[in-house]
Amino acid sequence: MNLMFMMLIIMLINLGISFYNARSAGQVWAESKAIGGWLRLLVWCGAIQAAIGFTMVYLIIVSYIAVSVGYISPQLMGVLFNLVYLMIIVPVIGTGIIITIQSWIAVARERSLMNIGTAGWNTFATAYNTYNAIQSFGPALSSVQEGLSGLFDEDSDSDNSTYRVILLAAIVLLAGVVTTSVIIRRYAASLPVSEEVRNAGLRDLSTR
């Protein structure tokens, strides 16, 4: 019960951060497209971070439903998590580094408590994600290679299970992208770009 409660809290926090990033990106999406440059890059980073966050929430929900109804085995749920992890970890680290650089630029321009806190969190999150990737990428890749070996076997049951894992991974990734796109379109051009935004970019994006 406690584990489920903690997982629910984490999912809600992830949803909140993802929605915030998607909305922030949407508010200046059209303007950043016109301005281009560093601001446009930051907006894309925010959108990618949002899509990844939504994807992870959908992954948890879909994987547990899939196991509960017998669509995939509990063992393949781990393979599914590792497959999605391999797909998102490079974008997570890449966008996190860019957002972290911007957050420290914001601190250099204005030493406020909020800017320092945001920069500190982004630095910690990016460092943790990078360290975790170094430790986890190899085992995750091995798990996926072993779990998806059914693609090359003559066992039809194994082959079907493999395709199911790939299908679920594609579904949750697509759902994360679509959710982000809908939010961006909903809030597009709802916030004028001030001179401060042109100079500083999206200083309040949060990485994960």
Report the location of each language-model feature.
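Short, Lys/Arg-enriched, disordered terminal segments
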Residues: M1-L3, T207-R208
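Alpha-helical transmembrane segments and immediately adjacent membrane-interfacial amphipathic helices
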Residues: N2-Q27, R40-G70, Q75-G150, D159-A189
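Short, highly charged, low-complexity non-transmembrane loops/tails of multi-pass membrane proteins
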Residues: G120, F124, L191-R208
